[in-house]
Each structure stands twice: as C-alpha cells, then as structure tokens.
Amino acid sequence: MKEHNYSVYMLASRSRVLYIGMTNNLHRRVWEHKNDLIDGFTKGYKCHRLVYYESFDDVANAIDREKQLKRWNRTKKEWLIHQRNPTWEDIAGEWYLRHQYKPEKQVPPRAG
C-alpha cells in the first residue's frame, strides 16, 4: 500500500494577506505558488511565503482541518502562525536553493 502525506498550509504576502490550501506534495505546491504557476488568489495577491503548515496521514483529516482553518477569523489564524513562526519567516525560503544555477568546478584535462 502506498503511503500518502497531506499538508494543510498557509501562505502570506509581504503585506500579510493569507491563503490556506491543502496538497499531497507540499514542496511541489509551494514551488508552484512561488513561481506564479497557479492562476488565482495567490498569484494576484503575491502570496509566496510559506508561514505555516501541518502534515496528515489521512486525506479526510487534512480536508477537515483546511475547512476549519478557513472558517477561523483573522486573529485566530495569526495566533496559530505566531505559535510556530512568530516572525512570519518564509519556512520554504531555502528549500529550492539547490536548484539555482551554480557553475561546476572545472577539472583540468589529464595529461596523457
């Protein structure tokens, strides 16, 4: 049986506009948001900072949690973020650095 992992996450813009979503691949989904590959709210409001997430083994639990968080008022959402990420740093800020272009070291040819 294939093991699944689901995440409920919150993205924020620089002005702290919040977006709540759910995915089965957090790294991929955040990368899509950061690169504006998804038309809609996050692209329009530039919600590119991952400020909070939770992981679930069961998709139904993840969906329930996403719906619950979306019903919460702004103050309660900010309280939750502050518990784990008081400065609202981008949790995914360094996830993709290895994908940036870095020239390889030049190896001198062997004398032969």
Across the structure, where does each feature detected by a protein language model lie?
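GIY-YIG nuclease catalytic motif and its immediate N-terminal context
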Residues: 1-38, 43-53, 60-67, 84-86, ...
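Short arginine-rich
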Residues: 44, 68-80
